């Protein structure tokens, strides 16, 4: 039996001899010594016989490292140190090392480019400014070949279309928004061209298309699609307004700026802080000479030219400033030393509020001193032109120029020469003013200013489109209503509501006409709450004792004028009066006596079952009348045989009525009613030979002039009723 001992290991090898473990340690040590990494950089892994706590702790450390790597990968970009952004040392370190100093130093965290032939920080992808240069024909010998950069589309309409034969079109509500297109045919060197300007809310496109090889001119939608692939299925309308050209040229040139304001900051030797720059009050002779080169020193009080935001009335922004005109443009300079100085204000806000709101500024350096673009905190300053005088005090001093701007600002001309040194004279002034003007135009293309410009362009384009459309329709003699129906527009909620009301009124009138024709012999059921008519005709009978006679008159037309349920008739009669102004039915108040004795009759007004009926009584209390008769009791008349007469049919219903003494009416002057009993067969009292049917006859004030008083008719008929009842009893 072998006497070799074995040791237990928690590694992945199970049972391992100690001799084998020792040999593994030796090999691992040799590998560690042979590698380039040092022991602290590359620690040895724990031995295979290490306790589990030691291996688990290293395992968790490895997990933490892996999680840290994953978190770094999930970040938008690698976190760089300040040294990764600084191509030069900080300005304090540069000043401590001593001169000569560079003119411009990139800020610690970047964000700017420097135009310098020897500097790799100048952006090369942009190449040149996106602004188009003016035509060379406009350049004079005094410009020294320096061109002003501006948007060619802004002046194209005035240069090529205004005052010449051309056509304008507008498109409403496309996927690209409102569009306005101008087209003109022209010929150059024997070749025909089609010059087109297409305006959208995003941009304005100006192109010249050759027509060689085309059998006919392309249509306006085809021209629009040639400029933009998304312009599909568009419908253009011609602009028919004599003054449309002036409106279009005003829109195109809203981006053209003929007034500029630039800041001028005086930087002395070894000044590296914003407070130090704005705190300078003295002007050196070299700085005064430079200001004289820029323009004329003017007095602000009552100044009539472009003031650039300075006070010309109360003198709150200083006494003097520098002003000049350049190629039909006005320029006002905000000179830091000429703006008001406030004692005790380290930031000098009276100066910074003007220079800080400028877009381009000049940094004049008295001596060789570095400048950092982020030295001045401002949201508007996007470009700086640094000018350093090299030979001050001489008759023709020289100036060294450097240009820096933010990264989102495209490059602008004229380019700096190599070396960038100019002699004092008209050429340097021409270069400097041209560079300043082009710098501001280029800064307007940066992200911050471009968003503002896009919103302004879209609003102005929509306004121009609406005005052209309105004037075109006015020239055609089309109003807003005709224009909407012509274009198929619904006109909004209000127009839809008006049309619905008109259709409803027309349908109501048609229904009323049909009701009159179908119910010419009786009462319309819709007016009495939907009550069905009996087969027998409505009769009107006078009492002639002792024999009851009925005279039947056929009506040639309906006695009821149907009124719309939307506008029920208003009752203005007083509620306190005792006269009944509603349809009433006679009801027996006491049971009939066997011997045919006296019975009292109570007549109560009933409310119609139709709430929209025009004859509804507004009184809640039911007025009643009691009639004592010696004759037989009058049975309650059926509602199916009751008839209602309105003001429209009253004339025919009252033709055979007996006339009585006229009495003043106590009812409302707007409506008068007559209560008439006409005997007719009743289904409820078959034993009686005749039953009294009450009839409500309404009278209007107009009919009362030619008719007898309804109150007298009521009294006369009640007298006849009493006389007939007494005669039958005897």
From Swiss-Prot:
Record's signal peptide: none
Phosphoserine modification, residue list: 7, 45, 507, 544, 558, 564, 612-613
PTM info: In vitro phosphorylated by cGMP-dependent protein kinase 1 (cGKI) at Ser-7; the phosphorylation probably does not regulate GAP activity.
InterPro entries in alphabetical order: Rap/Ran-GAP_sf, Rap/Ran_GAP_dom, Rap1_Ran_GAP
Biased composition (Basic and acidic residues): 618-631
Name recorded for this polypeptide: Rap1 GTPase-activating protein 2
Polar residues bias (residue ranges): 585-613, 661-670, 699-712
Keywords: Cytoplasm, GTPase activation, Phosphoprotein
Span list, region Disordered: 32-53, 509-533, 552-730
Tissue/organ expression: Isoform 1 and isoform 2 are expressed in platelets with isoform 2 being the predominant form. Expressed in lymphocytes, heart, testis and pancreas.
Modified-residue entries (Phosphothreonine), positions: 49
Function: GTPase activator for the nuclear Ras-related regulatory protein RAP-1A (KREV-1), converting it to the putatively inactive GDP-bound state.
Entry's localization field: Cytoplasm; Cytoplasm, Perinuclear region
Principal cellular location given in the protein's record: cytoplasm
Source organism, top-level taxon: Eukaryota
Effect of residue 357 to A: Abolishes GAP activity
Keyword Metal-binding tagged: no
